[in-house]
């Protein structure tokens, strides 16, 4: 099955290395229909922001769920302090980078939207709802921020202007 990669428009500075690694992950994981990428959350503001999609993984590195809400919720740690990220938890920011098997892409439009997909406005939840596996590459290199706000857009415009 061929693999197609999609970089969402809000990730204009996605490094080619991350794209290649995500496609390679899907090629190495025949049980998965999709692969995507994430990196460690580093700010409490991002953890609480609904513009930053979070992902939680199983013990094989596949997505359990995606959410705009703060997940996982370290209950006891946040009872003490909600001003900084708690230590000892893997808090992941999902990136708008996907690798798909062509066969799955053909099937995807025929799948009914999931209630959680409609609530969160996250189409990848439809794949999970319908029993598909999504492999997640956790990137450890520093990544340029995506575009979620007007300020982000201005920052990215400045990057592109500096490259001309």
What function would you assign to each model-found segment?
Residues 1, 42-43, 149:
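Residue-level signal for threonine
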């Amino acid at each position: 099955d061929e693999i197609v990669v999609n970089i969402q428009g809000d990730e204009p500075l996605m490094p080619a290395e991350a794209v290649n690694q995500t496609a390679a992950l899907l090629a190495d994981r025949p049980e998965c229909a999709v692969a995507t990428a994430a990196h460690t959350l580093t700010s409490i503001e991002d953890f609480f922001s609904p513009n930053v999609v979070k992902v939680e993984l199983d013990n094989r590195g596949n997505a359990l769920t995606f959410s705009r809400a703060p997940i996982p919720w370290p209950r006891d740690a946040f009872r003490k302090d909600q001003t900084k990220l708690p230590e000892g938890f893997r808090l992941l920011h999902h990136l708008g980078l996907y690798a798909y098997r062509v066969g799955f892409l053909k099937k995807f439009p025929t799948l009914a939207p999931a209630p959680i997909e409609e609530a969160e406005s996250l189409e990848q939840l439809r794949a999970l709802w319908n029993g598909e596996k999504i492999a997640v590459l956790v990137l450890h290199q520093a990544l340029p921020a995506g575009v979620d706000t007007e300020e982000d857009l201005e920052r990215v415009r400045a990057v592109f202007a500096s490259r001309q």
